[in-house]
Curated annotation (Swiss-Prot):
This is Levoglucosan dehydrogenase. Homotetramer. It catalyses: levoglucosan + NAD(+) = 3-dehydrolevoglucosan + NADH + H(+). Catalyzes the oxidation of levoglucosan (1,6-anhydro-beta-D-glucose, LG) to 3-dehydrolevoglucosan (3-keto-LG). Exhibits high substrate specificity toward levoglucosan and NAD(+) for the oxidative reaction. Exhibits weak activities (about 4% compared with that of LG) toward L-sorbose and 1,5-anhydro-D-glucitol, and activity toward D-xylose is also detectable (1.7%). Can also efficiently catalyzes the NADH-dependent reduction (reverse reaction) of 3-keto-LG. It comes from Pseudarthrobacter phenanthrenivorans (strain DSM 18606 / JCM 16027 / LMG 23796 / Sphe3). Optimum temperature is 60 degrees Celsius. It is an enzyme of class 1 (oxidoreductase). The keyword Transferase does not apply. Contains an N-terminal nucleotide-binding domain and a C-terminal substrate-binding alpha/beta domain.
Amino acid sequence: MQNLNVGLIGGGFMGKAHSLAYAAMPMFFWPAPALPVRKVIAEANPELAAEAARRFGFENSTSDWRSIIDDPDIHVVDIATPNHLHAEIAIAAAEAGKHIICEKPLARTGEESKAMYDAVKDKNIVHMVAFNYRRTPAVALAKKYIEEGAIGRILSFRGTYLQDWSADPNSPLSWRFQKSIAGSGALGDIATHVIDMARYLVGEFSAVNAVLSTWIPERPLQSGGADALGTVRGGEGPKGPVDVDDEVMTMIRFANGAVGSVEATRNAHGRNNYITFEIHGTEGSIVFNYERRDELQVAFASDQADRRGFRTVYTGPAHPYGEGLWPIPALGIGYGETKIIEAHDFFKAIAEGGSVSPSFADGYQVALIDDAIVESAAKESWVDVPQISA
């Protein structure tokens, strides 16, 4: 079992989640494929970097992310920064021969994502984009049922991701509301998770027809005191423009003939982290709700007439990733476990000299879908989704 030294760039919300995963992964999956060593963490502010190192268990801290790239003892570069920094860091890490895990979205645009993909595709390195919700055991179980043909040929997919943290017009103008940093709003921030799951479960998108809406066109300028999402109340004072979407709705045509839709917003009062999908096929249906993430609802046409309807499967040791989680079904998993599973699969690929999905290729394809959604909304028409070449 080898030790792999990790350099984490970004000490915020996602830095916390990734650090937890590195510490806990060997406790859940033992023997671990490799042992993540929390070597150094980078934050632009030296004091914040030092504090993050103490809090998240890193041996060292730095205010210069380039020192992580230049360090020959670092094996893994973890990018947990705002979106505008992803491409520069990832390309530098690839040129240095580091394995890379990058938070989603891969980048702000398809063009940036292509540059990242081009930087890694011919290198002998493992690269991953952190669409962690597909690591939820119930989602992986849905994939298993689909691959086994349990619901027949897929006809339709309906996915949503609804949050409410930006519904307050007085929440400040954090970077997530600025196109120059984020690239997009709800589209890149949360819809990408559902788009990734749609590709994972159903297949490639061939065309989209979308609407993008910005409900709150300006917000108070941020003056400190906000949390990782920028949510504080009482925004008196000057305001700045919001130039990203608050809500996205898109219809989908899949390459295999199925149809679908994705809706995402961060302005839905009462919806904290509401991720759902329904998949209907010729022989059955699958329903998932992340707020009940230990459960998968299934219905099969083959059931006798007096037993037809949805049944609930509680995930546990008999299901995907069950060997590393909890010994009794429905004991409950959280967001952290999806990150732990993600870390396990990433380090397993490194240890075995393999690859892992979702890779930068997947992140690039999602970015092309996002670009097509933006184009469709501007044109108010269907737009074909380009496919990356292998």
